[in-house]
Amino acid sequence: MERVMEDIKPAYKELHAFIRKELHEKYGGSVVNPRGPIPDHLFQQVREQAWQANSVIEPYFPKANLPPYDSFVAHYDAKDMINAAENFYQSLGFDGLDKEFYEKQLKEQDQSAENGDCRADIFDLTPHVYMKYCKKVEFRKFLQVHGYLGRLHYAKEKQNLPSYFFNSYDLEYPVGEAIILSASTPKHLQAIGLSKNFEFSDQILMNRLFRMGIHTMLNIPLYFVHTKVMTDLLNGTVEIERINKHYWELMVKYAGVEPPSDRPESAIDFPYNFYLDMEENHQTKKFVSEVLGYHFYRSFCEETHHKGYLHNCDFYGNMEIGNSLKSMMSLGSSKPWNETLVRVLGTNPSLSGDALLAYYTPMLDWLKAKNRESKVKIGWNSSQKKIL
């Protein structure tokens, strides 16, 4: 994980510098130091608004110019979205989900039980997997379903193993991420007829890529910091009395983010998602899945001999990729992690940031040119906030 953070550091600093400049122009020097870390509440605002009309990139890439994504799937219902996602996996050579699954293992969420984001629930009891799906129809849910079905197919492929090999190193999550990256491309949406009447210009492609990049590259340092705080606490590197101070030291070091105000000794500032890590290593899974998903995606695109920028590569219909995936999935945890990844990534697989950087190359080139033009500082000074 440290290697990934080191790999993406130069690119992250460019994005950080651009965001800080935009925030400084909007809120002034009394709120945002043009050479310092970004206040946490504004950093979180930028992250949450990545796909909104008030994003920091709005002056350059207006939300109004994005494709009408939700209208692409407006004629679907929830089961149509599941069938469309299932079609993607079948195009790779996976067996279809059987009648028993649709009749006994696929259930609609109770309306009273639906959470605000309305995410599906997956219960992996290999060889049986159960799914409670959300009835909400929007493009984001359409993509999420593609990821969820990766978990279902992973369970099916490893079901013949002894039960003590059912653990899959959580690789079903990056598989889902890679499928989502392909299913969301303009190339794929046009191929399956969802966007046949919409023309994707280079400007629109950059608009989409930039918003994806903000969401991805601002989340990765947070996943890392949350994981490191927990690790440092458990291995005795930091004492519990210093945990909040340690948290902010890591946020400044890795994310260039500081608290919005001085913090008293009694403060505990971890966000809610930090606590998700306590039982299931949630933030660690998110970090590895995000980064490894781009590795899988790039590997699949290389297998298709894709030409041009990586962010519009669609591997739908490629049986060889499906065979590679099934070969990896069928191993469960019967082989070590590295040997399992070899089935998809080839020799000597390792976790690094290079695939992610390759995906966002056009955005990063734009950022570097814009930052040179604006003559902004790249990187950040230490925080002046007092943290006791």
Per-region residue spans from a language model:
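Active-site-proximal, well-structured secondary-structure segments within enzyme catalytic domains
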Residues: M1-K132, F198-L218, G317, P336, ...
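C-terminal, non-catalytic "cap/extension" segments appended to globular domains
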Residues: Q45-K63, H75-D80, A84-N87, Q111-S112, ...
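Acidic/polar loop patches that form or flank catalytic/metal-binding clefts of enzymes
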Residues: Q90-F101, N160-F165, T185-S195, I240-N244, ...
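Alpha-helical recognition segments enriched in aromatics with Gly/Pro capping
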Residues: F101-S112, F123-P127, Q144, Y148-E157, ...
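Active-site recognition of the HExxH zinc-binding catalytic motif
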Residues: V137-Q159, Y173-E177, L181
